[in-house]
Amino acid sequence: MSSFLGKWKLSETHNFDAVMSKLGVSWPIRQMGNTVTPTVTFTMDGDTMTMLTESTFKNLSVTFKFGEEFDEKTSDGRNVKSVVTKDSESKITQTQKDAKNTTVIVREIVGDTMKTTVTVDDVTAIRNYKRL
């Protein structure tokens, strides 16, 4: 999992507003979500990974073990049950579930880019992060 470790800055995003809309995120929060460029930092302590997301809007930290469900509060305020699986050394999949939706977030390292694909039902967004 060393390919994920370190800091990543959002460099480009496609269709994120549509995903937020599908999740029922309010218009003002969607506007903020469309303008911020978060930095994501991954660290490992044994078999536990922490993902810290920092932006001018909000800072969030989630700590998890692969394959174990945990409670998570999303940046838009939803409470979800989440699980992260390790697909390979360079690819992880996070599944978030609440009463209404299932969100699948695939993060894959390709060179110095972390390609993040966010899917809710039939709506998909791509968010690319560059290694800092």
Curated annotation (Swiss-Prot):
UniProt keyword annotation of Transport present: yes
Pfam families: Lipocalin
One term of GO molecular function: lipid binding
Outcome after substituting residue 99 to S: In variants C, D, E, F and H
Annotated keywords: Cytoplasm, Lipid-binding, Transport
Task of the protein: May play a role in the transport of fatty acids. Binds to various fatty acids but not retinoids.
PANTHER family the record matches: FATTY ACID BINDING PROTEIN
Name the record gives this protein: Fatty acid-binding protein
Organism from which the protein derives: Schistosoma japonicum (Blood fluke)
Lineage: Eukaryota, Metazoa, Spiralia, Lophotrochozoa, Platyhelminthes
